[in-house]
Amino acid sequence: MADPKFQYLPYIAHDQPDVYETPDVNEAETSDYDEDEPVNDAIERLHISTKDSIGKFRGKYLTGEVDFSDGIGRKNRLGYDARSLDYELAGEGERETPLQRCHRLKCEMNELMEEIEASRADTGRTAEEKASHETVFGVVSTAKKVLESLKLEQVIGSEVVAGGAGGGDAEAKKLIAQIEEYRKTGAVSSSDPKVVANELVQSARVAQLEHRLHQLEVAVGAKPERISRLAGTTGTGNLIEAVQNISAKAALLQPSQLDTIEQRLNNLLQQMNSIQEKSNATGQDPNREQKILELYEIAKSTEPIVQVLPDILNRMLTLESLHKYATNFSKLFAELETTQASILNGVAANKTLLTGVQEAFAQNLENVNKEVKKLEERMTKLQQMIK
């Protein structure tokens, strides 16, 4: 054995080689031929198409939140829920009929109301969350009532309900029978779809307002005595302002605010005690007391003016701006007068210069005329001499 690392190991065959080669297998023994299995009628052979299976389960996924346990609790389990009624919903890619949509909305509203009921039982919720859940529950219940009172045949027509149900013909016939019963009893009063739609919208709005009014009556009370007592306590006749006033007062009663108020009161008490000690130590000064009395009399005499004082101040501020404008106007007017005087002086000087220029021009013109006459006389003499 050439490799020394196996020299001292137990159970090693030192007289045999390290590499072992298997002999070649005959090709006749490795044929791909499969013998046909015997056909047995007791065995059911399923013909599964892979393409159809992929198309059917495309977009589906498994979730780990499904609960199939047998635990008992107030909250519904997340396993498959077997309903008492069988509703046929539209498949993937198919157009949903009005009947199927109505059933689907009812199922979704029932599930939502069950979830809200389960959240009500949760003690860890805050008051705001519970109030919001109550509001949502009221709105959903109102919408459910409106959906239950929906006259499907009257709104969309009996032909659409009967012909568009698809596989749910039995349910469509059942719904048509119920509508016929309502029609016989006089439940249907109008045949105009627009009128019925408006009535449904108005009934939903009225139901929502009634629910909100019921919540206000539960919180405040429907008796006039309680409302008048609330208005007298808060000093306002508006319910929103009264609630804001009460919430502001309730905010002051929080532990953090109480500590701050107590600290400020203690500081104020200490300051008042120190002021009282200083006044007791210094004693009473007659002159000081006399001045305080005079100031009190002055303040008392000016009490009627206090109410008019803001208007007087506003008027004085307005007059101040007016006085500023008047001062600026007077300054501008004085500058204008100065400029006008300088212009008048310049005009007078220009008149004097103009008079002198006119006199000089007249004298020069007279001299020119004399010279022209002399020149003409000489010209005539010269012409006579030439002749």
Curated annotation (Swiss-Prot):
GO terms for cellular component: centrosome; cytoplasm; dynactin complex; dynein complex; membrane; microtubule; vesicle. It comes from the Eukaryota. It is a peripheral membrane protein. Residues 99-125, 256-282, 355-387 form a coiled coil. Keywords: Coiled coil, Cytoplasm, Cytoskeleton, Dynein, Membrane, Microtubule. It holds the Pfam family Dynamitin. GO terms for biological process: mitotic metaphase chromosome alignment; mitotic spindle organization. It is found in: Cytoplasm, Cytoskeleton; Membrane. Its main location: cytoplasm. InterPro entries: Dynamitin (IPR028133). Subunit of dynactin, a multiprotein complex associated with dynein. Modulates cytoplasmic dynein binding to an organelle, and plays a role in prometaphase chromosome alignment and spindle organization during mitosis. Belongs to the dynactin subunit 2 family. This is Dynactin subunit 2. The lineage of its organism: Eukaryota, Metazoa, Ecdysozoa, Arthropoda, Hexapoda.
